[in-house]
Amino acid sequence: MPARVDIGRFAKKAMSVADKRVEIQLGKVGALERIRSATGFDLAGYERVLDNYGVRHTMKQHGSQAQELRRGQIAVTLDDFGLIPLITAEPDLILHDGKNKVGRDVIVFAKTIDGIGYRHVEEIRSGKRLVVTDSMRKKKGAWGS
């Protein structure tokens, strides 16, 4: 599993790549029993991945302090992506959140760290046995279901 600083460095690099997919592997999916119990999905053997599309989407949709303030949230920073392993390994909440725009099932992992609630959304790519970052948000306090 890459270190937090390496993931943050990847996220910074990912912002400059729009014409092709680049990714960093974050390791095998853990918390398997909790995921299965909360969502019904068996992700044994799946790999967790962060790619430039997830980084770019998150920063475009949730990276503006002014926009997030209007939503009652806090802007995501590139360094926040380094928290993904912690958020997904020891989440406070896991839930299935339906399907995304391309029809893939999505799972939400929420965790409060130092008073900040992180909501990390991943899509399941069953054919390739991957879970890939779809989006991330953050706010003061915990996220509810």
Feature-to-residue mapping (PLM):
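Ribonuclease/tRNase effector modules and their secretory precursors
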Residues: M1-S145
